[in-house]
Amino acid sequence: MPVMERVAEETVATNNIQLKARVDDVPCNKLDARHNDMVIQSETANSDCPGSSAHRNVDLTKPPPPEEAAGAKLSVEELTLGNYRIVQGSNNTNVDSPRAGKFEHLYRLARGSAFRAGDGDLDSQPRDMDQMLSRIRQQLAGAPSERQNLKPFMSRRSDQNLEAFSERLRAAGENSIMNAPALISEGVQMKTPVSSSNFSQLLLKRAMKGKGVVGKNQETPPEFVSDQDLGSKEKKLDISKSPTPHDVLPLKSSPKGNGMVSHGDGNHSKSSIGISLREFLRSSYAKREKRHGLCLFRQLVELVDSAHSKRLFLLDLRPSLFTLVPSKKLRYIGNFGKNDLESDVDEDLNRRRPVVEESSSGGRDSKKRKMDLHLNSPGNQLQATSTGRPFKRKSPVIDLNMVDARNPDSCELQQQDYIKNLSVSSVSRKQSMSTWLEEQWYTCPEEINGEDIGEKSNIYALGVLLFELLCHCESGEMHAAMMADLRHRILPPTFLSKYPKEAGFCLWLLHPEPSSRPSARDILKSELICEDDSVKSTAAAEEISELLLHFLSSLEVQKKKKASKLLQDIQTLEDDIKEAERRYSSNVSLVRSHGAIEKRVQSSPLDEHCTTSSALFVPTANTDRLMSNIRQLEDAYFFMRSQINLSSSAATARSDKTLKDRDRCSENQNENQDMSTKGKSSDQLEVFFEGLCKFARYSKFETCGTIRSGDLLNSASVVCSLSFDPDEEHIAAAGISKKIKIFDFNAFMNESVGVHYPLVEMVNKSKLSCVCWNSYIKNYLASTDYDGVVQIWDAGTGQGFSQYTEHQKRAWSVDFSPSDPTKFVSGSDDCSVKLWSINEKRSLGTIWSPANVCCVQFSSYSNHLLAFGSADYKVYCYDLRYVKTPWCTLAGHEKAVSYVKFMDSETIVSASTDNSLKLWNLNKTNSSGLSPGACSLTYKGHTNQKNFVGLSVLDGYIACGSETNEVYSYYKSLPMPMTSYKFGSVDPISGNEYFDDNGQFVSSVCWRKKSNMLVAANSTGNMKLLKLV
């Protein structure tokens, strides 16, 4: 006989006997009157069988129908821990309703009239029992055949259970008191008579006793956390209080129990943080690698071993209950049970005690019951509480109302429910069937035989999982067939040939005898897992070796390149040494031919004004300076050498004549231009030697004079701009004091004067930002201020005579044209550059910039070339004849460009608040787009991050201020500072100078061309005349 039929018969019989035993013990005559209106309402669990329905409420305060009153003293209903609730005030007494009719056989069982005559002989009507069992067999005959064939290893004793059970069932009527737990199946719901609330609570306490829901709550290990457990805490049931409906109802659906996590649905195909292992296996039937499969298997074994070490085991070890997160880690979201050997001993002892002892000692709570596990298949729903011993699983609970053929309404309801079940979507049926099949694949032989399950059941499931992780299937149908054969320990030939070692290991795990299977710890120590570790170690070692080989090879290539470069540099140095010796020898021979100066050359090889070739012999005093800057000198030298071939290429030069387009030049300017052209050598080696000579020639700034022009009553004394007149006899200083002060140059030499007063002082309405002297008209000056006003002043009268107010924001810079003294240009924060004429009130033209204009400068070597610096980190050059597009754009600074100066006709120097100066070669620019290759050199050493510190150039020398209250000097061919000078603070009372920055900075510098002297001013209004020595 199939297992499902026998279990169903046992379920029915157990219900009947248990009900009778409990009803006979109810003290019906002593019910409390105040509880007569109390009704216990319950609903049966859902069944997969068509026709199942919920029981109707029965009012027990009224007598039963006449046909039942003879033998019935109390009507009963089905009571479970999940559907227990009390409804008061119910007056429903329609016992003859269709729903009540479904309980008719239960009423008969309760009053002993179901299978006995008036004398109470249970065997007097065996025909009714046979008919009931026959109907159950017919109903179960339509169940899937697979369910009846799940026991390839089931023992023969299962066939004998039904006969023994039938004998106990027939003998039940002969004993008024019998051991109900001996007949109760673990999947059967408890039947209890309805009585007063005190009696109901007593029954609930007894029902919960041993179920693990009233004991101490065991925490779930972190390896086995359910998705439902994240961020939630379950309430513990207090056993010191009487159970109430609120205490009992949550027990059935609680996601966490003592030793077990319960899920409402067996379908765990997806998770919010990954996919289930089943989905992964299904999606990679034919493309899985052995290494990856063994890696996942090792994680599974480690999880199982961790649970076993805590005396727990996994109740649902199957792929659907594992989640594979993106990090390729497995997470168990199923249930687990507690494996306690002491509980097994206690339960075996309690099972041998007579029922009389149990009845007399109802207050004893030490007895532990087995776990109540309802398995609805397919699409099962696990609802369980903890237990103190290994678990058993049984077939689904059969609703006894289904077999009540005497009630026609019951049949009608069965048909309706059957139709509803048929209307379930195909997707749901497919998922349910898939889950049901998976359960059958992973059910161990001892569970099918009805034996206890425990740690060894996990080992069997691991064997099935190992096969699934390694096998290759072309389709789902082939996979299902392989899994069906696996239950009989039949492995595919391809699997045996491809994985012989793994196949033997898999069969070891699938051994029919649990005692012959290894433990999880043995699996971790097995050759299969250790071999995987060795493979990983070998792979890691190979990877490290490959990485090391790649590193060494790359380093070798890099060093060979450096060696080649070094050899090339050495060859270059040898050639330049030979060239320098040749030049020096020729110069020495030339000098010696003049007998008048031969003695001088021998005594002093380096004169103060030495030639380029004589720079080979450096005075001892400058040796330390050269060696301290050897790295920068080296970079400058090799940069110069790299530019030799590029400078001789005509393709890199601009083809237009804008750089040297002069149609109005004075005689002096023509001479200066010719001298500049003659002085500029095309020999890069000679240029470098010249720079080295000049670097070695000067070592410091010497103070030649000081002008203290700061106002004692005005703290705002910053000098923003300095400018010499055409004859360089007077210097104009302007700043935020709103005054333009003109000093006599000779006043710098008079150190005896404490405070110097200007020759002329002109007052402006706003703070001044720039002043510029006209190079042709001696008395004319131009200034810009913070209001955006451009004004022309007459230094002879000390008055301004013309104002230009088209700028809308602060004007930063103004410059007169060297070729046309009546024209000047200004730049402003309104992003415009305006060209003016002294003879016109309105601007002659406007050039719009993408950002604020910080400085403007005319070229001294061209009539039409104009350059300005912008706050967008770029320098723009324009041909004034074509102002729609820039003549070139120079990009390379990292902050706003504060100053622009023409070094010569082909070179521009720019200053920025990024702590650097840059030298630009205009011959390497282009008219379309940026000119990244135009930057020849970058000078660093000074500090300039937020203030305008001044910039001035003369004959290859560059001077600028610093926010460290210093003046720095560079030479055009070398990137490092040649020398520097630090301003000191002057005590206004004593007049003594002390060195304390206190936030001061050098704000303006200006070269005096006649004497190679520099005038510098700082933020306190002090001006110094400095000379390179």
From Swiss-Prot:
> Where in the sequence does UniProt note compositional bias of the Polar residues kind?
377-388, 667-679
Q: What is the effect of changing residue 767 to E?
A: Loss of function
* Keywords for the protein's UniProt record, in alphabetical order: ATP-binding, Coiled coil, Nucleotide-binding, Nucleus, Phytochrome signaling pathway, Repeat, Transferase, Ubl conjugation pathway, WD repeat
Disulphide bridges, residue numbers: none
Q: Where in the cell is it found?
A: Nucleus speckle; Nucleus; Nucleus, PML body
Motif interval(s): DWD box: 866-881
Comp. bias intervals (Basic and acidic residues): 230-239, 654-666
Positions annotated as WD repeat? 714-753, 763-803, 806-846, 848-888, 892-930, 932-971, 997-1029
UniProt EC number: 2.7.-.-
**Per the database entry, which stretches of residues form a coiled coil?**
557-589
PROSITE patterns xrefs: PROTEIN_KINASE_DOM, WD_REPEATS_1, WD_REPEATS_2, WD_REPEATS_REGION
Entry annotation: catalytic residues: 316
Give the GO molecular function terms. Answer: ATP binding; identical protein binding; protein kinase activity
Phenotype of the disrupted gene, per the record: Reduced hypocotyl elongation in blue light.
Pfam families (alphabetical): Pkinase (PF00069), WD40 (PF00400)
Extract one GO BP annotation from the record.
red, far-red light phototransduction
Q: Which domain of life is it from?
A: Eukaryota
Q: Where do the segments described as Disordered lie?
A: 42-69, 213-269, 347-392, 653-679
Q: What class of enzyme is it?
A: transferase
Q: Give the Protein kinase domain ranges.
A: 188-529
Q: What does this protein do?
A: Controls normal photoperiodic flowering and regulates circadian rhythms. Required for suppression of photomorphogenesis in dark-grown seedlings and for normal elongation growth of adult plants. Integral component of the COP1/SPA E3 ubiquitin-protein ligase complex. Involved in HY5, HFR1, LAF1 and CO degradation.
Q: Which PANTHER family match?
A: PROTEIN SPA1-RELATED 2, PROTEIN SUPPRESSOR OF PHYA-105 1
Please provide the record's free-text comment about the domains of this protein.
The coiled-coil domain (557-589) and the WD-repeat domain are sufficient for SPA1 function. The coiled-coil domain is necessary and sufficient for interactions with HFR1 and COP1. The protein kinase domain may play a role in promoting destabilization of SPA1 under far-red light. The DWD box is required for interaction with DDB1A.
Task: Describe the protein's quaternary organization and the partners it interacts with.
Answer: Interacts with CO, COP1, HFR1, HY5 and PHYA. Light induces dissociation of the SPA1/COP1 complex. Binds to CRY1 in response to blue light, this interaction prevents SPA1/COP1 complex formation but stimulate CRY2/COP1 complex, and thus avoid COP1-dependent degradation of the transcription factor HY5 by the proteasome and promotes hypocotyl elongation.
Q: What is this protein called?
A: Protein SUPPRESSOR OF PHYA-105 1
Q: Give the organism the record lists.
A: Arabidopsis thaliana
Which lineage?
Answer: Eukaryota, Viridiplantae, Streptophyta, Embryophyta, Tracheophyta
Q: What gene does this protein come from?
A: SPA1
